[in-house]
């Protein structure tokens, strides 16, 4: 192959966002600034990797049908260490992309890694891809109808995400340079293992090109408020007049609940505001400091001037979780986890807090707890939910409709039970997203460490058999909660890696699975009503209620099977030389699912027995040869954040002669 290689490393330039971050780091820490500069291409490549993987699987601009695998020896002049390369044709752009393949996995996923190369098909020259936007340019030439406001925004998103990816991985390289132990050991030995696990997920979503999106924040704010930088955050407390708010709580009224959650704080606030105000006329709301500085004093100044919203001088010391807007105290503090509104663009959406979230959270908790208590099928599984105990949002009935919704969503608080109130001392809690994480000085992910521990504790002969037993225990707990809920009650929990907390025993096995965050779940309204649970008291703007059985199924399957179990199984398989291990682990998941469905059929509780036809319909869809896959990149380019786009992919749960 006669190619004239052109390498551009010598002319690598910062874009504006990278330059601003670099200047911030030069002022903050010159060593960090140097590492940031050295890792620019690595950070960009991690976002390019997500873009290429998703466009191929989604067949965006025929990236899958116009691709093929080639041997790396066919391009011996390139710096590629893998055996195979993914070649993707862009015929309209007259360019060809080369992406080194690191693995092929379930649901038609091909994993790639940088460096990536683009060949100009006219001049026959190859250049190294320096930024994911070079790939986006090819996409838009292939599909000019996608060149619009959404793609313009996506272009800026990729710049922001790549900058923050480098920001994050360079901090990890700096802060952990003296560490060498497996990441799980570091998490386990931390004062607060759960919080440390949230902070360990440096790269964000494993598949989303906007994994590190933080639009709306400058470098200093990103450093202060993002989980990976481990900074304490002083949450602001405001009093909001009862006539300008709506509240909901799980058992006792909102004020009583908050008083029980923060007894010392209430005394401090009473001393601060009495006798200036009638404390009983106000509700307590927690506000993110960025939201207070950026939004409160601009959009709510009239209410502040009238003392209908009052800022307290007291603050709460919290830390950001992986999701940015969910914050937690550091152990041994037992105050609640708090989900807040933030007008920051993260992973494709502005993360305000909808009215339905603060209203429906406690209501959903009440329904789920009632189901879990009364339906014996759940007694067999080591899984439960984390209560959302109270919520509040701003509400001015005098505001016009759209303006009213906007202002309500910008000022809201949801309180969630602290995980340490739910678990025994001898287990280690962590967010499952961290199970697949690594760091530069030890590439053993926590899930591999846990399996090795189990192998040793159980005196098993090899890693592969240990992995199969580990996956069986884990998937039984996860699916034993999700599948009966969606099948019997039409409730599809969004149980992806980020929406769970898992606790592990000393022998490495899962102890209990806890599912949290009910904002993104979906409910088959008719099915839940048929099971004698009313939805009439849900928020009038509820997006979680639907008549679409497909929407409900896809929500449960994508989050739980494709994302949650899919990432874990993929990571385990990469740690083994057995090319059949991934397939065999999916067989185990299929067996676990078969057993759960059998238990559903055998249920003797006539009062809440599900129709067997419904069970068979769900089984037929779940075990079909092809299954829907959510197209995250296509949705961003089509500006369809709330209307999901799917493509059919091969289903690893399918067996001939089902």
UniProtKB/Swiss-Prot annotation:
InterPro entries according to UniProt: Aerobactin_biosyn_IucA/IucC_N, IucA/IucC-like_C, LucA/IucC-like
| Enzyme class, UniProt record, top EC level | ligase
Q: Which organism is it from?
A: Staphylococcus aureus (strain NCTC 8325 / PS 47)
Keywords on this record?
ATP-binding, Ligase, Nucleotide-binding
Pfam families reported in the protein's UniProt record: FhuF, IucA_IucC
Q: Tell me the superkingdom of the source.
A: Bacteria
Output the Gene Ontology terms for molecular function: acid-amino acid ligase activity; ATP binding
- The transmembrane residues are none
Keyword Nucleotide-binding listed: yes
Name the EC number(s): 6.3.2.58
Family listed: Belongs to the IucA/IucC family.
Q: Which gene encodes it?
A: sfnaD
Q: Supply the name of the protein.
A: D-ornithine--citrate ligase
Q: Which reaction does it catalyse?
A: D-ornithine + citrate + ATP = N(5)-[(S)-citryl]-D-ornithine + AMP + diphosphate + H(+)
Gene Ontology biological process: siderophore biosynthetic process
Q: Among its keywords, does the record have Transport?
A: no
């Amino acid at each position: 192959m006669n190619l004239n290689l052109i390498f551009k490393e010598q002319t690598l330039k910062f874009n504006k966002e990278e330059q601003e971050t670099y200047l911030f780091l030069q002022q903050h820490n010159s060593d960090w600034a140097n590492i940031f500069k050295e890792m620019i291409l690595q950070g960009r490549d991690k976002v390019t990797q997500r873009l290429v993987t998703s466009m191929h699987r989604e067949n965006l601009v025929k990236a899958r049908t116009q691709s093929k695998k080639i041997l790396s020896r066919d391009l011996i002049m390139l710096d590629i260490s893998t055996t195979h390369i993914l070649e993707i044709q862009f015929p309209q752009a007259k360019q060809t992309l080369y992406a080194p393949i690191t693995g092929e996995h379930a649901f038609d996923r091909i994993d790639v890694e940088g460096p990536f190369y683009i060949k100009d098909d006219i001049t026959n020259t190859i250049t190294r891809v320096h930024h994911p936007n070079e790939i986006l340019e090819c996409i838009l030439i292939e599909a000019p109808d996608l060149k619009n406001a959404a793609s313009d925004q996506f272009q800026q998103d990729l710049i922001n995400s790549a900058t923050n990816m480098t920001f994050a991985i360079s901090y990890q390289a700096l802060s952990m340079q003296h560490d060498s132990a497996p990441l799980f050991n570091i998490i386990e030995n931390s004062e607060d293992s759960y919080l440390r696990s949230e902070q360990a997920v440096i790269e964000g979503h494993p598949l989303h090109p906007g994994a590190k999106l933080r639009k709306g924040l400058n470098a200093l704010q990103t450093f202060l408020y993002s989980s990976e930088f481990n900074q304490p955050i002083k949450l602001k407390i405001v009093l909001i007049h009862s006539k300008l708010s709506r509240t909901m709580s799980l058992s006792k009224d909102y004020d009583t609940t908050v008083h029980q959650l923060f007894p010392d704080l209430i005394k401090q606030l009473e001393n601060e505001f009495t006798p200036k105000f009638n404390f009983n006329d106000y509700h307590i709301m927690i506000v993110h400091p960025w939201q207070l500085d950026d939004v409160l004093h601009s959009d709510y100044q009239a209410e502040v001037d009238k003392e209908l919203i009052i800022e307290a001088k007291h603050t709460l010391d919290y830390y950001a979780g992986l999701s940015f807007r969910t914050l937690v105290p550091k152990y041994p503090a037992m105050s609640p986890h708090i989900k807040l509104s933030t007008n920051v663009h993260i992973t494709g959406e502005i993360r305000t807090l909808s009215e339905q979230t603060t209203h429906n959270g406690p209501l959903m908790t009440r329904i789920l707890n009632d189901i879990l208590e009364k339906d014996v099928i759940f007694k067999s599984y080591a899984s439960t939910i984390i209560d959302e105990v109270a919520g509040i949002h701003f509400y001015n009935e005098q505001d016009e409709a759209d303006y009213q919704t906007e202002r309500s969503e910008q000022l809201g608080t949801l309180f969630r039970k602290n995980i340490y109130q739910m678990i025994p001392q001898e287990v280690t809690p962590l967010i499952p997203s961290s199970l697949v994480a690594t760091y530069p000085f030890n590439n053993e992910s926590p899930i591999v460490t846990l399996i090795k521990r189990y192998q040793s504790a159980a005196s098993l002969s090899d890693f592969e058999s240990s992995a199969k037993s580990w996956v069986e225990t884990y998937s039984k707990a996860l699916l034993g909660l999700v599948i009966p809920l969606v099948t019997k009650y039409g409730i599809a929990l969004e149980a992806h890696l980020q929406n769970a907390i898992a606790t592990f025993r000393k022998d490495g096995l899962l102890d209990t699975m806890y599912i949290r965050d009910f904002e993104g779940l979906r409910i088959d309204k008719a099915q839940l009503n048929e099971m004698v649970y009313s939805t009439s008291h849900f928020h009038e703007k509820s997006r979680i209620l639907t008549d679409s059985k497909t929407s409900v199924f896809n929500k449960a399957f994508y989050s739980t099977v494709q994302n949650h179990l899919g990432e874990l199984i993929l990571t385990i398989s990469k740690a083994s030389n057995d090319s059949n291990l991934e397939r065999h682990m999916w067989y185990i998941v299929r067996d676990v699912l078969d057993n759960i469905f059998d238990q559903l059929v055998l249920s003797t509780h006539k009062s809440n027995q599900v129709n067997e036809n419904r069970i068979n319909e769900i089984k037929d869809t779940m075990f079909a040869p092809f299954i829907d896959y959510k197209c995250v990149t296509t949705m961003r380019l089509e500006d369809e954040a709330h209307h999901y786009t799917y493509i059919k992919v091969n289903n690893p749960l399918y067996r001939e002669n089902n």
